[in-house]
Amino acid sequence: MSRNPRYDILFDPVKIGPVTAPNRFYQVPHASGMTEANPRVRAAFRETKAEGGWGVVSTGALSIHPSSDDSPLPYARLWDKNDIRSHALCCDAIHSHGALAAAELWHGGASVMNRTSRIAPYSPSGISWAATHVGFMGNLRPRVMDKKDIREVIAWQVAAAKRARSAGFDIVYIYAGMGYLGYEFLLEEYNHRSDEYGGSVKNRVRFVREMIEATKDAVGDTCGVALRISLEELRGKPSNNQSSEAHEVVELLSDAPDLWDVKMDSSPTDCGASRFRQECAHEPIIDFVKKVTDKPVVGVGRFTSPDTMVSQIKRGVLDLIGGARPSIA
């Protein structure tokens, strides 16, 4: 059966830095509950998505260092060269169907549990994520990062990005959302610093920008570099310079990543089922991003209708149609 030509736009290739997605269907990062214990099962799981036609297939969060140890919850990691082989299986499986493989590199900051490593969680100002957010994440009292800690975290990100490239990933992420370390630097209620990493919005984005720039310097010649960022809380914060702090953050970082992956803040808002959340539910929060940056933008929104997907692209809301559960169903 031939395809209706009005949907052809959904199958256009999209350039993401030095790599090109073969179409606009993008499986955004999502947890699978699979750890390093079952690499072949994990590879087969992601391969099924690529076989189904997704242009980009992403991992879930990959810890970059033992200071971001999410035990007792299951989690994946890219801590050292021993982890490269298992992720190479996944990349090879994804590539066998012509899709790109994306690695969601992750440091959880104050929200991790560290039940195995026993390392005090890292944070901008020593404030537990559970101080204002109730959820499944850790509630330990975190340490305040000094500038040496900041340099170390950036170095861990770079090392993990290089390992991701060695495994075969085409896109590597910096994660600044959902309560994790980059996001904690962006939010004034968690970032009380008085140095160049705190205070104004311009200072609060500095850590995220440095993470992006260091990652691009390390692997940007061969890998696309994506920023995953939560915008819901920032959109609600007034700014002296823009319509909201979300607008200001995106403007300050507009040229930094090769791809913007934009989302809501927490599971109840970000992951509500389509029977309860209407299509394009995220649009009122993320609709401004493409007006600020020339880089491609991916987002989700309970998409079930190809006509809605086409509309998102033609109206300049998204460049890539993101989904997680549709890639599993």
Where are these regions (language model features)?
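Flavin-dependent oxidoreductase catalytic cores
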Residues: M1-A329
